Amino acid sequence: KYEYLCFKRDSSKNAIKSKLTSFQIKLIDIKKNNLSLKLDIEINPFHCGKGVRICHPNVIINGYTGDNCIFHGNNVIGNKKTGAKTDVPKIGNNVDIGTGAIIIGDVVIADNCVIGAGAVVTKAFTTPGTVIAGIPAKEINGENNG
């Protein structure tokens, strides 16, 4: 809802509607910030798909996640220093992200991938069902490695 309201506010030509929408965004922001402090989770206004599960605290998501992704805790998903909204990770559906895994930059993770605990992902993995691990992250099984 937050993303929708931001889009609605930015595209509105009616000043009153725009101010009302801005007020709604502020209320949602307050609720979100209180919940973030309580649960130790930060999800920025990008896109989280349906059924996303966060198993343990300390998760920061600043990117796009598909449906049914699992975060096991202490995860950082975000952009590099640029701060551009387009330089964020795009994670497919049904991706399992292990404890302490970090995904940084404008990378794409295909559907049904598994990212191992502590992996640092800085490049794209476009083969569905790939198991990814290591620092820097590498494919450790899948179609390419048999």
Model-based region annotation:
Residues K1-L39, A137, E143-G146:
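Terminal amphipathic alpha-helical/low-complexity segments used for targeting or macromolecular assembly
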Residues L39, N44-P45, G49-G51, C55-H56, ...:
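Left-handed beta-helix
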